[in-house]
Amino acid sequence: MKDEHNQEHDLSQKELESCENSCTCEGKKQEASEKECEIKEDFELKYQEMHEKYLRVHADFENVKKRLERDKSMALEYAYEKIALDLLPVIDALLGAHKSASGDDKESALTKGLELTMEKLHEVLARHGIEGIECLEEFDPNFHNAIMQVKSEEKENGKIVQVLQQGYKYKGRVLRPAMVSIAKND
């Protein structure tokens, strides 16, 4: 009987150990599962952060790419601006020669030649986006540079009286403002 009792005790001891082992295993499994969940959550957070960083960097890259394309386009569009600036004194000389021709010389071959040359030059310039600045009545500091003020009975204060030097634009951008005199009546 004692053997039987020992056997039962041994058996119950084994069951208890087995149960403890299984509980420990289940506990370890649960602990491992919790750690796996934490690791997975950390991974997902880091993945989200990295993905957001990637999207921002990609957007920045696209913006830089667009800006470079725009800058390149502007550089190509205004590449001839320096040449246009260098041509302006030639135009001024032609205009001066034309203006200095006296009334009798207006019909001379030289005057007609100057007029044709100026006309052709203006056509070429217009074809390449270079145009003269209009100097009508109103003074506009964006397009005109007031060199002097003169008394004028015919013009109101601040109105353009005389164009001293023609101004030019290249594709809408001012190459050189027109030099003008404006009316100043006290």
Curated annotation (Swiss-Prot):
Residues 1-32 are annotated as: Disordered. InterPro entries: GrpE, GrpE_coiled_coil, GrpE_head. GO terms for cellular component: cytosol. Its main location: cytoplasm. SUPFAM superfamilies: Coiled-coil domain of nucleotide exchange factor GrpE (SSF58014), Head domain of nucleotide exchange factor GrpE (SSF51064). Residues 1-17 have a biased composition (Basic and acidic residues). Keywords: Chaperone, Cytoplasm, Stress response. One of its GO terms (molecular function) is protein-folding chaperone binding. The keyword Chaperone applies. It comes from the Bacteria. Gene3D superfamilies: 3.90.20.20, Head domain of nucleotide exchange factor GrpE. One of its GO terms (biological process) is protein folding. It is found in: Cytoplasm. PANTHER family: GRPE PROTEIN (PTHR21237), GRPE PROTEIN HOMOLOG, MITOCHONDRIAL (PTHR21237:SF23). Belongs to the GrpE family. Homodimer. Participates actively in the response to hyperosmotic and heat shock by preventing the aggregation of stress-denatured proteins, in association with DnaK and GrpE. It is the nucleotide exchange factor for DnaK and may function as a thermosensor. Unfolded proteins bind initially to DnaJ; upon interaction with the DnaJ-bound protein, DnaK hydrolyzes its bound ATP, resulting in the formation of a stable complex. GrpE releases ADP from DnaK; ATP binding to DnaK triggers the release of the substrate protein, thus completing the reaction cycle. This is Protein GrpE. It comes from Helicobacter acinonychis (strain Sheeba).
